[in-house]
């Protein structure tokens, strides 16, 4: 990826960081809150990223004075597409927001289920000792918890030098947001089902943003304002990306055709080999397609899904 594309992906990953700021008790809308946090507390001075965070919604974007090829327009459209795909209306919900609501299980409504299972407020534990299984106990977030998450973001984001875009920073940022936001709901609207995490929404937005940039570049489109903002309804119908599936056939035969002696060790070794082999294939694909690991939706068991650019 080139420097500009790295900035675009980073902007998309950070576009909703203001939700952490707002839920920690800072009474400012999440767009401005994210902008102020990154600029004043992190010391980030990259105009592209700051504009994208502050103007990723229609109203502030329409009032802002930006270049026609501003990164903010890509973040705006990518956020809209991701939001359309990961939010469902709660039929019994009343208008408003419940900022302390916990993340619900995606299995609550799957296959016509009608369950009420919730994840506890938690960060991913490097030790692996804690497994956050959803339960009927609804443990809500507190402003203190969000303040702790904000503090961790402050400490870790300051270690990334955004003035020198490096592709590895994308992976570091992706891992950081995964660790802190996997169990934080993206939307706390009482009219929506809160079963999509802030991490998954941010990752999906980054995946779309990377594809859209490459699509526009391939088609010689430099006026992002007209293409993505003024004519956004037309762009939604364009095939700028696709869902791609890859499968390594015959893995069961490869794994289980073994001798009895040392069977467990051989099973582990072959499973690990397949996992590394698939990761290598994905890294090669992403490198050729000039995309980031945000575009990987799922990988495991010799199978994967990713979102690449569509050039048709």
Segments the model singles out, each with a brief description of its role:
Residues 312:
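Conserved small/polar residues in nucleotide/adenosyl-binding loops
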Residues 126-191:
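Extended, charge-enriched "interface" segments that sit outside catalytic cores
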Residues 30-34, 197-205, 267-278:
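Phosphate/oxyanion-binding active-site loops and adjacent basic polyanion-contact surfaces
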Residues 244-253:
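Catalytic-site or vestigial catalytic-site microsegments of nucleotide-handling domains
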Residues 281-305:
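Conserved helix-loop-beta segment at the catalytic/binding core of cyclic-nucleotide signaling proteins
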Residues 1-7, 20, 33-44, 199-231:
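Alpha-helical phosphate/pyrophosphate-handling elements in metalloenzyme active cores
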Residues 261-289:
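Surface-exposed, low-hydrophobicity interaction/linker segments
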Residues 1-131, 184-188, 234-236, 256-267:
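Divalent metal-dependent catalytic cores for phosphoryl transfer on phosphate-bearing substrates
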């Amino acid at each position: 990826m080139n420097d500009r594309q790295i900035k675009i992906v980073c902007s998309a990953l950070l576009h909703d960081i203001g939700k952490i700021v707002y839920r920690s008790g800072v009474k400012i809308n999440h767009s401005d809150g994210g902008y102020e946090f990154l600029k004043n507390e992190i010391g980030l001075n990259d105009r592209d990223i700051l504009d994208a965070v502050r103007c990723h919604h229609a109203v502030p974007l329409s009032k802002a004075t930006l270049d026609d090829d501003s990164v903010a327009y890509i973040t705006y459209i990518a956020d809209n597409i991701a939001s359309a795909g990961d939010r469902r209306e709660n039929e019994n919900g009343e208008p408003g927001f419940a900022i302390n609501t916990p993340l619900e299980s995606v299995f609550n409504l799957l296959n016509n289920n009608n369950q009420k299972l919730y994840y506890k407020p938690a960060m991913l534990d490097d030790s692996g000792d804690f497994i956050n299984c959803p339960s009927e106990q609804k443990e809500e977030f507190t402003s203190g918890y969000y303040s702790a998450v904000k503090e961790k973001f402050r400490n870790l984001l300051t270690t990334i030098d955004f003035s020198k875009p490096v592709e590895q920073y994308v992976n570091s940022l992706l891992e950081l947001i995964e660790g802190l936001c996997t169990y934080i709901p993206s939307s706390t609207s009482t009219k929506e089902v809160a079963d999509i995490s802030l991490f998954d929404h941010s990752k999906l937005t980054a995946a779309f943003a990377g594809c859209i940039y490459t699509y526009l570049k391939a088609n010689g489109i430099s006026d992002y304002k007209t293409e993505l903002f003024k004519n956004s309804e037309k762009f939604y119908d364009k095939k700028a990306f696709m869902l791609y599936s890859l499968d390594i056939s015959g893995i069961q035969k490869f794994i289980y055709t073994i001798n009895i002696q040392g069977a467990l060790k051989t099973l582990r070794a072959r499973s690990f080999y397949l996992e590394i082999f698939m990761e290598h294939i994905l890294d090669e694909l992403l490198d050729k397609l000039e995309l980031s690991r945000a575009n990987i939706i799922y990988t495991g068991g010799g199978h994967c899904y990713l979102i690449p650019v569509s050039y048709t």
